[in-house]
Regions:
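Extended recognition/assembly regions associated with phosphoester-bond processing machinery
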Residues: 1-191
Length: 191
């Protein structure tokens, strides 16, 4: 990962948040990844580690920047399992789960297999409407919008896993969404 980051120009900001396969606890919210995981790049000015979920403001458009709600999406599996309409096609259309969670204003609205950290505040509540919601747990690419919110599900760079084969899910690897912050239009690049 560090070798990959080294190839990215310094004027491009990198925001890294943990997911369910990373070296951190599974219960959410997940703390940001520790310094010792990235010994060479941890002090780079363009490398930022955040918790999961996290809302960040990026690039001061109209002096305030766009609010990006970043959430890996570990609760998606449990949520899909409990709602028939989502169960039928959510793995092929991951934006449907994300939009459903935006409607509910909660990232883990169903109690079940998703592990939540017992904290005084529910960090999974979507308190402020984001401008952009970004996720990636399903390893499938999707771009949509819901009531003015750009909904982006990142694919991964990993081929189909054994688990995905068992459940009949074909990931969509190597797709990256580029969002124009001024007009909110998206472009997809295949790598």
């Amino acid at each position: 990962f560090e070798d990959w980051v080294d190839r990215i120009p310094e004027d491009i900001q990198i925001i890294a948040g943990p997911g369910n396969h990373d070296i951190t606890r599974l219960s959410e919210p997940q703390p940001r990844l520790q310094d010792d995981i990235f010994p060479r790049i941890k002090d780079y000015d363009n490398f930022h580690r955040v918790q999961n979920p996290q809302t960040v403001r990026l690039h001061g458009i109209e002096s305030k920047g766009l609010k990006h709600l970043m959430y890996h999406g570990y609760s998606f599996d449990d949520h899909v399992d409990r709602i028939q309409e989502l169960r039928e096609n959510a793995y092929d259309e991951p934006e449907r789960v994300m939009i459903d969670l935006l409607k509910r204003r909660h990232l883990a609205p169903t109690y079940g297999s998703n592990q939540l950290s017992p904290e005084g505040t529910d960090h999974m509540v979507i308190e402020e409407e984001p401008d952009v919601m970004v996720s990636g747990h399903f390893h499938s690419h999707a771009v949509s919008s819901y009531k003015g919110v750009n909904v982006i599900c990142s694919s991964s760079f990993q081929a189909q896993t054994d688990f995905q084969k068992r459940v009949g899910h074909e990931p969509d690897p190597g797709k990256v969404t580029i969002l124009n912050f001024e007009n909110r239009k998206t472009e997809v690049k295949q790598f």
